[in-house]
Amino acid sequence: MACGLVASNLNLKPGECLRVRGEVAPDAKSFLLNLGKDDNNLCLHFNPRFNAHGDINTIVCNSKDGGAWGAEQREVAFPFQPGSVVEVCISFNQADLTVKLPDGHEFKFPNRLNLEAINYMSAGGDFKIKCVAFD
């Protein structure tokens, strides 16, 4: 899946929140947000799948360490609708990342890379970024 946005040197620290708002395509199959050190070292691969890779209305999360993917974690909460504008907030600490979905539901994903700062973000798929903010 090609990335539509790549940002580096973010220097997001523990406790800070990355807020991403964008528009889901009307015919969306899936989209992704990646956070980490770089493309080969991701503490979070966030991949809502409407109908892709055998998953329907499922959020698939993973990490990548030195280019090797970890074990996938699936979330059943799926507040995304094709054609809608959504906002996702992600914060982290030494132990895990907290993802707050558009409906207010939150889940945690382990900080498997033990990153002390998030410097890289990429986004892609059927999602058009409207705003990125740091809180």
Swiss-Prot record:
Under SMART domains, the record lists: Gal-bind_lectin, GLECT
N6-acetyllysine occurs at which residues?
K13, K29, K108, K128
Keywords (alphabetical) are:
Acetylation, Apoptosis, Cytoplasm, Extracellular matrix, Lectin, Phosphoprotein, Secreted
Annotated GO biological processes are: apoptotic process
Q: For a beta-D-galactoside, which residues are the binding ones?
A: H45, F46, N47, P48, R49, H53, N62, W69, G70, A71, E72
The SS bond pairs are none
Membrane-crossing residue ranges in chain numbering = none
Task: Spell out which residues are annotated as carrying N-acetylalanine.
Answer: A2
Record-linked SUPFAM superfamilies? Concanavalin A-like lectins/glucanases
| A GO CC term assigned to this protein in UniProt | extracellular space
- This chain belongs to which protein, by name? Galectin-1
